[in-house]
Amino acid sequence: MADNNSPPGSVEQKADQIVEANPLVKDDTSLETIVRRFQDSMSEAKTHKFWETQPVGQFKDIGDTSLPEGPIEPATPLSEVKQEPYNLPSVYEWTTCDMNSDDMCSEVYNLLKNNYVEDDENMFRFNYSKEFLRWALRPPGYYQSWHIGVRAKTSKKLVAFISGVPARIRVRDEVVKMAEINFLCVHKKLRSKRLAPVMIKEVTRRVHLENIWQAAYTAGVILPTPITTCQYWHRSLNPKKLIDVGFSRLGARMTMSRTIKLYKLPDAPITPGFRKMEPRDVPAVTRLLRNYLSQFGVATDFDENDVEHWLLPREDVVDSYLVESPETHDVTDFCSFYTLPSTILGNPNYTTLKAAYSYYNVATQTSFLQLMNDALIVSKQKGFDVFNALDVMHNESFLKELKFGPGDGQLHYYLYNYRLKSALKPAELGLVLL
């Protein structure tokens, strides 16, 4: 279970097309190619010794169709699960983080704000808000014991954090209870202390105590072994600011005024019946989502309680819109995005990059292009600088036409203690982890 994705990278515009800053040949991003490059670049001494001891797909097993799909290790009796926490180095101690407490929430927020994932050039760092963290960490049926901190014994300062939340994820035809592992963060000055492996083992132990034996997680780095590798795409909403802060660059033969004109959007959504989601829409949205997600090889298994928590709009956290037929009043289409700003490091004029991230979208009557263009319009109205999307589900069908450009960030998806016989294409994945 692992560190989350890095902030999406930069995008370069060229003439009236959008091209990536670090071009990748599409055929070169297959899982086998990525793994081969990884293995070629790693000496034997640097291989992932920790992950080789864990029940995860191993690089050496890729292509071995004799291995069964499903759990790698069987569930063990709860009485045999280690009852005491794993030992930390003597100067540290475990703490359980109560996200209902304002003080505790502030501690977690500040740790992440100052030490969480940065882009490769150290220009941007994720800045999850306190409201976002409470939303992400307190879904229906959450376990406070899965919100795990590490303190320095002497100063009592929070120096590391890892979290899990319960989820139901369908893998092929089987719905599996899992933990979604996220927000693994160790203070920058303690990165050499090998805290992460023991934190991963501890959250795994606590998950096992609730009789859950599988997990899902993402990382911006390659570990053994991704079930799929997704590409980040970015759509400029405020191109001047994005260029000024170094997120994107002015393309060859492009002026700033031409670039602004290229990305200009209408002032209001154009789809009749397009409106903000309300509590009364939860049953209809749940039906739409369940039907849509059923076509993907791995997907989240939403019920109404999940939809109410994850998709009802929350200011500066998550936005959801739908199309209600003016004639029948049926809910026919749905789009959503969550708010994840990044701190801009070392820029004298700007401190925050406001980014929207595509979440779950379903189009049945409205064209997907028109639905997502309306999502871009409302995100621009709400002051976002950029709209980000992964090439999961059917997202690839709108990315190029709506002027998204591929970034240099990739996100690898993993399952813990569950083997897939073959890797998925991004378009076969119906799961978005925050």
From Swiss-Prot:
Transmembrane segments: none
Enzyme active site: 434 (proton acceptor)
Binding site for tetradecanoyl-CoA: 48-51, 184-186, 192-196
InterPro entries, A to Z: Acyl_CoA_acyltransferase, NMT, NMT_C, NMT_CS, NMT_N
EC number(s) per entry: 2.3.1.97
Coiled-coil ranges (or none): none
Subcellular location: Cytoplasm
UniProt tissue specificity: Expressed ubiquitously, with higher levels in young tissues (at protein level).
Pfam family, one: NMT_C
Family annotation (PANTHER family): GLYCYLPEPTIDE N-TETRADECANOYLTRANSFERASE 1-RELATED, N-MYRISTOYL TRANSFERASE
The name this protein goes by in its record: Glycylpeptide N-tetradecanoyltransferase 1
Gene of this entry: NMT1
